[in-house]
Amino acid sequence: MAKPATRNTKKKVKKTVVDGVAHVHASFNNTIVTITDRQGNALSWATAGGSGFRGSRKSTPFAAQVAAERAGTVAQEFGLKNVDVMIKGPGPGRESAVRALNALGLRINNITDVTPIPHNGCRPPKKRRV
């Protein structure tokens, strides 16, 4: 009699990362939060648009807070405890995303603004007339 087929698959080992980097990209329209390890390998990410906010609600501080909470909770499953925060962009979700990461219990070591500043590069968009 033949044996029932069994698969020889190994259980995937979940890596544990204690120190990481939280990249917050806050544009005027959306906020993207990516949490990586020190080498830059992504552990988790979330956006304000992917968190259920659409249209003008996507560009609010509350939407950035929800996105940071979603990315942070997934990263904590990897054992993340300490983060360095890199903030890029002029958007409204800059500060609330950092506050949300702090409220999750992640220890924030330092906060760095890495917004690219042109040395007279491209012409900026025209001013809004409302």
Curated annotation (Swiss-Prot):
Coiled coil regions in record: none
One of the GO BP terms on file: translation
GO MF, one example: rRNA binding
GO cellular-component term (any): ribonucleoprotein complex
Gene3D superfamilies: Ribosomal protein S11 (3.30.420.80)
Signal peptide limits: none
UniProt-listed SUPFAM superfamilies: Translational machinery components
Keywords associated with the record: Ribonucleoprotein, Ribosomal protein, RNA-binding, rRNA-binding
Xref: HAMAP family: Ribosomal_uS11 (MF_01310)
Subunit note: Part of the 30S ribosomal subunit. Interacts with proteins S7 and S18. Binds to IF-3.
UniProt cross-references to PANTHER family, sorted A to Z: 40S RIBOSOMAL PROTEIN S14/30S RIBOSOMAL PROTEIN S11 (PTHR11759)
Function: Located on the platform of the 30S subunit, it bridges several disparate RNA helices of the 16S rRNA. Forms part of the Shine-Dalgarno cleft in the 70S ribosome.
Similarity comment text for this entry: Belongs to the universal ribosomal protein uS11 family.
UniProt cross-references to NCBIfam families, sorted A to Z: PRK05309.1, uS11_bact
Name assigned to this protein: Small ribosomal subunit protein uS11
